[in-house]
Amino acid sequence: MSIDSLPPLREVIERHDLMPKKSLGQNFLFDLNLTSKIARQAGDLRDQPVIEVGPGPGGLTRALLAQGAYVTAIERDDRCLEALAEIAAHYPGRLRIIAGDALEQDFTALFPEGPKPRIVANLPYNVGTQLLLNWLLVEPWPPFYSSMTLMFQREVAERIVAKPDSDHYGRLGVLAGWRTQAKIAFDVPPQAFTPPPKVMSSVVHIVPRETPLPCRAEALGQITQAAFGQRRKMLRQSLKSIGGAALLEKMGIDGTRRAETLSVEEFVALANACLP
């Protein structure tokens, strides 16, 4: 059934009293041209499984279904479930709704067989970074998903794609650069949302590397957390709790350098040396 046969989103929100909750990091998208653009960025979705986190009233959900996807939508706001159920009725067998917190979801169990899902979502701003970290550090690798097309605040998007010696380079950039190839696809202005956030947003497209540099995810997660937790300090100080100066000397890395100057490859080498 056509997306045009569904009632307008503003009507759905009014009927179900779905004003966005700041406590849940909700900013709803009404522009169907924009939601369709996000869905297209994920590639050809015909008969492909898609995971959507935080669908809210279902603006992006509609676009994904209209492009032929099989959508699994995870929503913790019970107020939105009835509106999503109405969409499911228009697309029989194509929308699975899971009521719950995405941070507690076992994503690997959602698709035990068949093609890997794509993750496509306008992520709630208050949990978006943590969800991405979880998906970057998931084991085993290659991961349970084939790609991610995600909306973030522009500042977070810049951290994901940042390179060494740049203002935005940090733990997120190291982990994303290690295991994936990420790019900012396009920006979304505040006025596209209800309520409009105070900052620009960006859609990021992320594709997993089949064979990233060998390293334990837990080890790299720990060493980047230590290094960037005190990013203005020299490495011999910020890494003091895990060997500091001796470890850096062993690896031939100048202990007076700061975390933002190290390449992904250097972080991987440090992680392999200190946390085998």
Curated annotation (Swiss-Prot):
Enzyme Commission numbers on file: 2.1.1.182
Compartments where located: Cytoplasm
Keywords linked to the UniProt accession: Cytoplasm, Methyltransferase, RNA-binding, rRNA processing, S-adenosyl-L-methionine, Transferase
Binding site for S-adenosyl-L-methionine: N27, L29, G54, E75, D101, N122
GO MF annotations, alphabetized: 16S rRNA (adenine(1518)-N(6)/adenine(1519)-N(6))-dimethyltransferase activity; RNA binding
Stored CDD domains: AdoMet_MTases
InterPro entries per the UniProt record, alphabetical: KsgA/Erm, rRNA_Ade_diMease-like_C, rRNA_Ade_Mease_Trfase_CS, rRNA_Ade_methylase_Trfase_N, rRNA_adenine_dimethylase, SAM-dependent_MTases_sf
Disulfide bonds: none
SUPFAM superfamilies assigned: S-adenosyl-L-methionine-dependent methyltransferases (SSF53335)
Catalytic activities: adenosine(1518)/adenosine(1519) in 16S rRNA + 4 S-adenosyl-L-methionine = N(6)-dimethyladenosine(1518)/N(6)-dimethyladenosine(1519) in 16S rRNA + 4 S-adenosyl-L-homocysteine + 4 H(+)
PROSITE patterns given in the database record: RRNA_A_DIMETH (PS01131), SAM_RNA_A_N6_MT (PS51689)
Gene Ontology cellular-component annotations: cytosol
Function: Specifically dimethylates two adjacent adenosines (A1518 and A1519) in the loop of a conserved hairpin near the 3'-end of 16S rRNA in the 30S particle. May play a critical role in biogenesis of 30S subunits.
Protein family according to the UniProt entry: Belongs to the class I-like SAM-binding methyltransferase superfamily. rRNA adenine N(6)-methyltransferase family. RsmA subfamily.
NCBIfam families per the UniProt record, alphabetical: ksgA
The protein's name: Ribosomal RNA small subunit methyltransferase A
Organism from which the protein derives: Brucella abortus biovar 1 (strain 9-941)
Lineage: Bacteria, Pseudomonadati, Pseudomonadota, Alphaproteobacteria, Hyphomicrobiales
Name of the encoding gene: rsmA
